[in-house]
UniProtKB/Swiss-Prot annotation:
It holds the Pfam family Ribosomal_L2_C. PROSITE patterns: RIBOSOMAL_L2 (PS00467). Belongs to the universal ribosomal protein uL2 family. One of the primary rRNA binding proteins. Required for association of the 30S and 50S subunits to form the 70S ribosome, for tRNA binding and peptide bond formation. It has been suggested to have peptidyltransferase activity; this is somewhat controversial. Makes several contacts with the 16S rRNA in the 70S ribosome. It comes from the Bacteria. This is Large ribosomal subunit protein uL2. It comes from Metamycoplasma hominis (strain ATCC 23114 / DSM 25592 / NBRC 14850 / NCTC 10111 / PG21) (Mycoplasma hominis). Disulfide bonds: none annotated. SUPFAM superfamilies: Nucleic acid-binding proteins (SSF50249), Translation proteins SH3-like domain (SSF50104). Keywords: Ribonucleoprotein, Ribosomal protein, RNA-binding, rRNA-binding. Part of the 50S ribosomal subunit. Forms a bridge to the 30S subunit in the 70S ribosome.
């Protein structure tokens, strides 16, 4: 998808860019049977307390029900549209099965309108087809990867993401994947994945340009702790611009912010990670 840049009529538009949706999307209205109302939470829980800061005030939107499981085996589906989804970075495609059922799927890179895709154990290695990892050859890029059988895709679902199949382990029970982050991990060979990469890979190149666009997305300003009062943040207070006055930076709740491991050391999935993503940097 091409990047569209704007003339510098104002300072906000000087470096702003966006994706050229008209050149790549079909422009159809979303399928009403696959829409669900999406209430706004503004980062609050059921008590009205803020649990996630810097959220609120976004545009209203509907949630598109996405089929991450792809369990209609052996029934051909025809790609009808490539649409914009406000709830994710990737585009989505409306597919119509031969029995008449309509579903949304993540739109893979290179998929075409009118293309026929399949799900099943022994389908062809073609972009958009969904099959077990054990039946996909080495070197193939896949997305929408399951972590548990029939759970639905969990890994590699955002725009431009994918994982490469490196091979199988000695037992043949697991398939070894290399993720975009550089992490190498094992996944059960009976888990399914979709062949190809997720489309809309230029999403990461977009420059927001001005604060107003982030407000429409529901992202509120992030205020520095040192600019607050001492009753609002451990870094706050002082006459003018002062150091934080502590040995290490703190979170708003008084915990150390840097150098603390955020992943559980005894997490069960550690046994499946062959190489951590940080070891590749």
């Amino acid at each position: 998808m091409a990047i569209k840049k704007f003339k510098a009529y104002t300072n906000g538009r000087r470096n702003m860019s966006s994706l050229d949706y008209q050149a790549n999307l079909t422009g159809h209205a979303p399928e009403k049977s696959l829409l669900v109302a999406l209430p706004t939470k503004a980062g609050r829980n059921n008590q009205g307390k803020i649990t996630t800061r810097h959220q609120g005030g976004r545009l209203k939107r509907f949630y598109r029900i996405i089929d991450f499981k792809r369990q209609k085996d052996g029934i051909p589906a025809t790609v009808k549209t490539i649409e914009y989804d406000p709830n994710r970075s990737a585009n989505i495609s409306l597919v119509v099965y031969r029995d008449g059922e309509k579903r949304y799927i993540l739109s893979p890179k290179g998929i075409k309108i009118g293309q026929v895709i399949l799900s099943g154990d022994n389908v062809d290695i073609q972009v958009g087809n969904h099959l077990p990892l054990a039946n996909i050859p080495e070197g193939t890029f896949v997305h929408n990867i399951e972590l548990q059988p029939r759970q639905g895709g969990i890994i590699a679902r955002s725009a431009g993401s994918s994982a490469q199949i490196l091979g199988k382990d000695e037992s043949g029970r697991y398939v070894i994947l290399r993720l975009k982050s550089g992490e190498v991990r094992k996944v059960l060979a009976i888990n399914r994945a979709t062949v190809g990469e997720v489309g809309n890979e230029e999403h990461s190149l977009v420059n927001i340009g001005k604060a107003g666009r982030n407000r429409l997305r529901g992202i509120r300003p992030t205020v520095r702790g040192s600019a607050m009062n001492p009753n609002d943040h451990p870094h706050g207070g002082g006459e003018g611009r002062q150091p934080i006055g502590r040995k290490s930076p703190m979170t708003p709740w008084g915990k150390r912010a840097l150098g603390v491991k955020t992943r559980a050391t005894k997490k069960a999935s550690n046994q499946f990670i062959i190489r951590r993503r940080k070891e590749t940097k």
